[in-house]
Structures are given as structure tokens and as C-alpha cells.
């Protein structure tokens, strides 16, 4: 298998803890509670999930493209969500989730280039300039370990999927 995915699974657990911390802080119900992977309240998300799983199962290159797409969606969503809140704790979590998604996108991009050439993935939700600025920059350090057990999140469909299911 591809190491990209096993590494990201570990960071996703930490990312889920960060979001759980915010849900607890603000006494919000977890919209993913009791749901299996791919189960969403919104049928549009269920359809997207099924489409991406099918696409990613075709080959390693397709799986990497799906991973890049999900990270790209997360980055676009997190950029918007960060602009929409004034709460420092929420901004902090979103900023760290976004950093994780940028690092994951770099990883997918680098592996795609190794496996299939320089133009393997074309961004769909970020401009080419935004995408290039991310993938041609150094991996970012930081993290979420210092905030009361909060972790980080990218790759889960942070804005799009978090409202109704599990990726």
C-alpha cells in the first residue's frame, strides 16, 4: 500500500480529537455519532463519498488523486471557515487543521509526481497559484498537542463532510 494513507490515518485521529474538543466546549452534538464511514445525513455527501471510493479503488494513482482532491477541498473549506469566525479557539483549530491538510496535499502531490509525472493532478478548488504555493513550499511544523488534548483534522472533509457523516 501507499504510506501516505497510513500516515494520514494517524494524524486524522488526532484531528478528530481537536474537533471533539470544540464540540464539547460549545456543547454541540457530534453529527457523526453513530455513523459508519461514508454514512452522511446529506445524500449529496454520500454520493460524493461513494464516487471517490470507487475512483480511488481503480489504481494507486487514482487513490492519490482522490486524496489530493479531499485535501484541496479541506483547505478551501477551512480557509472560508477561518474567515467566518472570531473565536480564537476555533481559529486555532482551523489553522492547525489547515496546516495538516497542506502537509497532506504536499505528500500526495510528491508521490503522484514520482508515480506518474509532473502534471498528474490539476487543482479543482484552489487556483493553480494557491496550489503551487502549497506544494512547492516546505512541510510545515506545528501541531495541536499543546491545547488540552486537542489534535488536528485535515482530510476528513473538514467543512463539507463534518456536518453529517464520517469520511
Language model features by range: what are they?
Residues 1-167:
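All-alpha RGS (Regulator of G-protein Signaling) helical domain and cognate RGS-like helical scaffolds
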Amino acid at each position: 500500500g501507499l504510506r501516505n494513507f497510513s500516515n494520514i490515518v494517524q494524524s486524522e485521529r488526532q484531528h478528530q480529537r481537536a474537533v471533539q474538543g470544540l464540540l464539547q466546549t460549545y456543547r454541540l452534538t457530534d453529527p457523526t455519532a453513530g455513523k459508519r464511514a461514508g454514512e452522511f445525513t446529506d445524500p449529496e455527501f454520500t454520493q460524493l463519498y461513494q464516487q471517490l471510493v470507487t475512483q480511488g479503488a481503480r489504481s494507486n494513482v487514482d487513490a492519490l488523486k482522490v486524496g489530493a482532491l479531499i485535501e484541496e477541498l479541506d483547505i478551501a473549506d477551512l480557509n472560508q471557515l477561518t474567515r467566518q469566525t472570531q473565536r480564537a479557539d476555533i481559529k486555532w483549530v482551523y489553522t492547525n487543521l489547515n496546516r495538516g491538510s497542506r502537509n497532506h496535499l504536499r505528500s500526495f502531490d510528491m508521490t503522484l509526481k514520482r508515480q506518474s509525472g509532473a502534471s498528474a493532478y490539476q487543482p479543482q478548488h484552489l487556483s493553480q497559484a494557491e496550489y503551487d504555493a502549497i506544494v512547492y513550499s516546505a512541510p510545515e511544523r506545528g501541531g495541536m498537542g499543546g491545547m488540552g488534548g486537542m489534535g488536528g483534522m485535515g482530510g476528513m472533509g473538514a467543512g463539507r463532510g463534518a456536518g453529517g457523516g464520517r469520511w
